[in-house]
Structures are given as C-alpha cells and as structure tokens.
Amino acid sequence: KQTLKEDVIKNAVKVINPKNINEFGKIMELINQNILILCDTSSITNKDQQRFIDMVYGGVYGLKGKIKEISNKIFLYIPQNFDLIDDSEKS
C-alpha cells in the first residue's frame, strides 16, 4: 500500500535546473519512476547543452516517454504513463 507522500510524489512535477551533463542520470532515474520533469537547461554551458539535450532525448524516447520543448532551453520530459494535451499545436 502506498503512503500519501508516495502518492503526492507520483502526481508531482519535478523542476530541475541541471548544472552540467553529469546530471543526465538523475533525469533518467526520475523518468523511469514515472515522474514528470520540467527541465531548464540554461545553467549548462553552451558547449555541453546540445549534447545534454541529445542524451536526454535518446533516454526519454528509449523509456517510451515524450518531450515537449517549451523554449530552446526549457523542456518538459513526460513519462510513458502521462498524456500530453497541447492546445498550442496546430491541426
């Protein structure tokens, strides 16, 4: 039986502001635990930012998740058990 704290964690959005590409593993662990992540990559150096984004894209898609780019530095990483309803997409 889950506790209230576990239920709250599972229904929460985790906001992450990684400082370097070494934090990739933390994001994959959270996605694997079905935690929705809002990630601001602006603290990662420009040199490493694209590499970090590519690594996370591969990992999230490998776990059957989805990614919504909010801006060029902010991303929503969506585990497989979440649905994305995006009113901003054109029909």
Cite the ranges covered by each PLM segment.
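Terminal membrane-proximal soluble interaction domains of membrane-associated proteins
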Residues: 22-90
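A generic structural signal for short
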Residues: 15-16, 45
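N-terminal leader/presequence segments that are low-structure
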Residues: 1-15
